[in-house]
Amino acid sequence: MILHAQAKHGKPGLPWLVFLHGFSGDCHEWQEVGEAFADYSRLYVDLPGHGGSAAISVDGFDDVTDLLRKTLVSYNILDFWLVGYSLGGRVAMMAACQGLAGLCGVIVEGGHPGLQNAEQRAERQRSDRQWAQRFCTEPLTAVFADWYQQPVFASLNDDQRRELVALRSNNNGATLAAMLEATSLAVQPDLRANLSARTFAFYYLCGERDSKFRALAAELAADCHVIPRAGHNAHRENPAGVIASLAQILRF
């Protein structure tokens, strides 16, 4: 079994760019940014429980890494960068730390490196279980209306929230809930030490209005790019700013 994805082919000799979306997104999420890099072959992946991979269930990050590895092999992708937002960034960091043949580097936008104590994990597990229950039992428009009121999305205006609620409500609530719990921060290890000892290139992007993830970025041994005029979802709020940062990274 492999993950559903959309592949766009560029010039031979350059590494692939493999894009991983955030929670409740899909393979279209990164395309406005990714299509600015037409010289590179691009793979836009649907993570388990999302989009064309909605029917694929996983028990945890090991399963996601295994599926990602098999998907890369199926497309004969030998050299690549992982580019991930939020959940996709956490998947990218986990997979990279577990080891992926051909990995050139990881570019993470607003991805959490992991909670650092049992109390934080227990609180996150309670929270994610409550959200998962709502995703399973309530209309998605109502759930996402509350989801986007969370502090991490404070930089969004009302129009942006309405647009995101309408877009995300096309998902399957049950499969979102399953993926939310399988890849919860409550079950993700703290990756800070692994990332410090990494053998791959590692870059971190965060919006200038995203104070939580700017603080997290400062804890990581990564080259950090702050995206102007953006909050947590920087590639959506300022795609040109993210394109500029990716172009700078990929020139090295």
UniProtKB/Swiss-Prot annotation:
Gene Ontology biological process terms in this record: menaquinone biosynthetic process
Enzyme class: lyase
Gene3D superfamilies linked to this entry: alpha/beta hydrolase (3.40.50.1820)
Catalytic activity: 5-enolpyruvoyl-6-hydroxy-2-succinyl-cyclohex-3-ene-1-carboxylate = (1R,6R)-6-hydroxy-2-succinyl-cyclohexa-2,4-diene-1-carboxylate + pyruvate
Source organism, top-level taxon: Bacteria
GO molecular function, one term: 2-succinyl-6-hydroxy-2,4-cyclohexadiene-1-carboxylate synthase activity
Entry keywords, A to Z: Lyase, Menaquinone biosynthesis
Transmembrane intervals: none
Function: Catalyzes a proton abstraction reaction that results in 2,5-elimination of pyruvate from 2-succinyl-5-enolpyruvyl-6-hydroxy-3-cyclohexene-1-carboxylate (SEPHCHC) and the formation of 2-succinyl-6-hydroxy-2,4-cyclohexadiene-1-carboxylate (SHCHC).
PANTHER family: 2-SUCCINYL-5-ENOLPYRUVYL-6-HYDROXY-3-CYCLOHEXENE-1-CARBOXYLATE SYNTHASE, PROTEIN PHYLLO, CHLOROPLASTIC
Protein name, per record: 2-succinyl-6-hydroxy-2,4-cyclohexadiene-1-carboxylate synthase
UniProt source species: Escherichia coli (strain SE11)
Gene: menH
